[in-house]
Amino acid sequence: TTAVELSDGRGAESLSRFAWERGDLVLGDRGYAKANDLVAVADAGADYVVRIGWNALKLRTHDGLPFDLFAALDRLPEQGMAEAEISIALDRAGTRRSPARLVMLRKTETDAEASRCKARRKSRRQGKTVNANTLKAAGYVLLLTSLDANRAAAADVLALYRVRWQIELVFKRLKSLLDLAALPAKDPDLARSWIYAKLIVALLLENVCHDALDSPPCAEPIPPADDLSMAPASPAA
């Protein structure tokens, strides 16, 4: 199924905007890592793989103690991978918790430094001093998932998350090919109708392209073997 909700500029990204079903798999970036939303996905029988920041959620051990994230990260070698069975605290006291699995990957030093530079630039633009933990966490990929290890190993979870970039590319393609970023109408209702029309066109194009790719790349059907005649080669002069 395809679900679309079109909001105004004041509407925040949230997994609560959609109705999830058993068998669904949610892929989301840091903006979707909200504790109650993730629990709602799991309660619906769906699963999630989302990226998180070091302080986005209150992570706990299964005993309810604070999970020492940076101690776990310190044990990883470059490009090393690890996972931990944890829980997400749903209230301040941490008495209500939801089980989850944390997958951690240490980046190469080159990639880590690029991420740290990005974090510093963002802090400068906001007129702030970058947090030391933010710089440290920039050297890692942190994924939270409801998938257990029997269904998806840590490497599989990381591979699933990389599929998210294909989704990003779809929206970039929409903005480029359909001029989706330009709104010719100022009225909210007209603008909404215009965007919906563009999205319908995009879905139709996607179906047409899919059918074309499934078709053989020849204009004429290949005749049966019985209809083919094999003429002997002409002798060389």
Go through each PLM region and give its residues.
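Single, function-defining residue in the core of a domain
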Residues: 1-237
